[in-house]
Regions:
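Extracytoplasmic thiol/disulfide redox context detector
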Residues: 4-84, 156
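Cysteine-centric redox/oxidoreductase cores and disulfide-bonded domains
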Residues: 82-157
Length: 157
C-alpha cells in the first residue's frame, strides 16, 4: 500500500510542473518588434551556422518541412553571427544568395564542412575557392559577392 501511495504521489507531483509560462517570470517580451519581409504572412526564420553540427543534421528535415508549408507561411534562413569567427560562413551564405545558387549549394556546403571535412567554416579563401569551383563561376565574381556593399548591409542587420 505504501508503494502504491508513493507511486501516485510521484505521478501527480509532476503535474505542478505543467504551468503556463508567464511573461516577466518565465520569459521577457521585447519592446522592439522584428520587421518581416512577408507582410500578412507567418514568417519562420531559421538562425543557423555552417560550423554547427546540429544545424547540419537538422537541415534535411527543415528542407522537407519547408517544401510543404501552407500558403500563408514563409521560411527564411538567416546565418547567425554572435561571434567574429562566424562572419565568414555568413558571408558564404549571403554570397550564395547574391549569386543565385543558394538552393543548389547550401546543402553541399554543409557537406563539404561536416561530412567531407574539406575546410573550416571560417576559412575565407577556401570558401571562395569552393563556391567558385562548385558554382562553376568566375573567382572575381565570387570575391565581389563576398566583399560587396550589400554584403556589409546584410551582415550588419
Amino acid at each position: 500500500m505504501k508503494k502504491l501511495l508513493l507511486m501516485i504521489l510521484i505521478l501527480f507531483s509532476t503535474l505542478s510542473l505543467a504551468v503556463e509560462p508567464m511573461p516577466g517570470v518565465n520569459f521577457k517580451t521585447t519592446k522592439n518588434t522584428i520587421s518581416t519581409e512577408s507582410k500578412n504572412k507567418i514568417e519562420v526564420i531559421e538562425l543557423f551556422w555552417y560550423g554547427c553540427i546540429h544545424c547540419y543534421n537538422m537541415d534535411p528535415y527543415l528542407d522537407k518541412w519547408a517544401d510543404n508549408l501552407p500558403k500563408d507561411v514563409t521560411f527564411k534562413r538567416v546565418p547567425a553571427i554572435p561571434r567574429k569567427d562566424w562572419v565568414e560562413s555568413a558571408k558564404a551564405y549571403y554570397a550564395l544568395e547574391t549569386l543565385g545558387i543558394v538552393n543548389k549549394l547550401h546543402e553541399k556546403l554543409f557537406d563539404a564542412i561536416h561530412k567531407e571535412k574539406l575546410f573550416k567554416h571560417n576559412d575565407t579563401k577556401a570558401l571562395i575557392s569552393w563556391i567558385t569551383l562548385n558554382g562553376k563561376l568566375d573567382k572575381k565574381k565570387v570575391e565581389s559577392a563576398f566583399n560587396s556593399f550589400s554584403m556589409k548591409a546584410k551582415l550588419s542587420r
